[in-house]
Regions:
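Long, charged, glycine-rich C-terminal linkers/tails
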Residues: 74-91
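Extended, charge-rich C-terminal regions with high alpha-helical propensity
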Residues: 132-168
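Charged/polar, solvent-exposed surface patches and flexible loops
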Residues: 6, 10, 60, 64-67, ...
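Short linear clamp-binding motif
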Residues: 1-22
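Intrinsically disordered, low-complexity regulatory segments enriched in Ser/Thr/Pro
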Residues: 92-143
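Surface-exposed polar/charged interaction patches
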Residues: 14, 18, 68, 72-75, ...
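Contiguous, amphipathic alpha-helical segments that mediate oligomerization or scaffolding
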Residues: 21-73
């Protein structure tokens, strides 16, 4: 019986040691999972901060170039810019006056949905393009606004001009 008692005691001690190791391993897995979740949250926040900054930069640039276009020829362009009631989207609509073909460019910078929408509504057709915020540069927005004013481009147009390509 003494051999049995010793073997039983040894088995129970081994079981207890395995249980302790399992508990430690589970705690380590929990710590690793929590660290990974925290890292993912921090990265998501960093990306959101980058998108918010890009949105602010694009809003400022689009407002500036639209204002410059309007100031250059106020009798030729109707320019409307502003925020939606929710404060989520910034809109710019630029239309021509007394030009052929007639044309309107609508640009929507949507911070919360991480999108930039550009839509041509013209006498020669309509087109729409959608990008992610980080794909759009201030230069692309300036190119779109310049296209509104490019009379030689529109004089023989049979369709709206192609949208600028993202450098990404």
């Amino acid at each position: 019986m003494d051999d049995f008692q010793a073997a039983l005691k040894q088995q129970l001690e081994r079981n207890a040691e395995l249980q302790r190791r399992r508990a430690e391993a589970e705690q380590e897995m929990d710590r690793a999972r929590q660290a990974a979740e925290e890292q993912a949250r921090a990265e998501a926040q960093r990306q959101q901060d980058v998108r918010n900054q890009r949105h602010a930069d694009l809003v400022e640039h689009l407002s500036d170039v639209a204002r410059q276009l309007k100031a250059a020829q106020p009798e030729s362009f109707i320019v409307r810019t502003g925020w939606t009631e929710s404060g989520e989207e910034f809109l710019a609509k630029i239309s021509t006056r007394q030009t052929e073909p007639s044309r309107s460019l609508l640009i929507e910078l949507d911070r919360d949905d991480d999108q930039v929408l550009a839509r041509w509504i013209t006498g020669v057709g309509n087109t729409v393009e959608l990008w992610r915020l980080l794909e759009v540069t201030p230069a692309m927005l300036a190119e779109l606004v310049l296209q509104v004013a490019d009379e030689p481009l529109w004089r023989s147009a049979t369709a709206p001009p192609p949208f600028p390509r993202s450098p990404r």
